[in-house]
UniProtKB/Swiss-Prot annotation:
SUPFAM superfamilies: GlnB-like. This is Nitrogen fixation nifHD region GlnB-like protein 2. It comes from Methanobacterium ivanovii. Belongs to the P(II) protein family. GO terms for cellular component: cytosol.
Length: 122
């Protein structure tokens, strides 16, 4: 099994979920996150102003951009399809398109039924 973690633009989350659902991958976790790439900020994108004074002083010149992070666990043989599908929806060719991480998952357990392994994620 693989965990696919994708950090994408907020305006791409709905289409990404639709495509993954159409492929049979509807189980996922989605979060609103803030972050930045090596460019520190992207001109034209909204930045997140930190309200807490202590954190703001530590922030310095760094500005954080709102993003969405989705995470889903899929069988090994489906990882490439999921990654390619996420890329197809989210690639604009511009800085800020996002990142996709693919991580190995040793095991999974469905709490309600005690199913484990791929049975717990399918």
């Amino acid at each position: 099994m693989k965990e696919i973690i994708a950090i994408i633009r907020p305006n791409k989350i709905n289409r990404t979920k639709e495509v993954l659902d159409a492929l049979g991958f509807s189980s996922m976790t989605a979060n609103a996150v803030f972050g930045r790439g090596r460019q520190k900020a992207i001109v034209g994108e909204v930045t997140f102003a930190i309200q807490n004074k202590d954190l703001r002083e530590e922030e310095g010149s760094m500005r954080y951009i709102p993003k969405r992070m989705i995470s889903l666990v899929v069988p090994d043989e489906d990882a490439s399809l999921v990654v390619e599908s996420i890329m197809k929806v989210n690639k604009t060719g511009q800085i800020g398109d996002g990142k996709i991480f693919v991580c190995p998952i040793e095991d999974a357990v469905r709490v309600r039924t005690k199913e484990s392994g791929e049975d717990a994620i399918l």
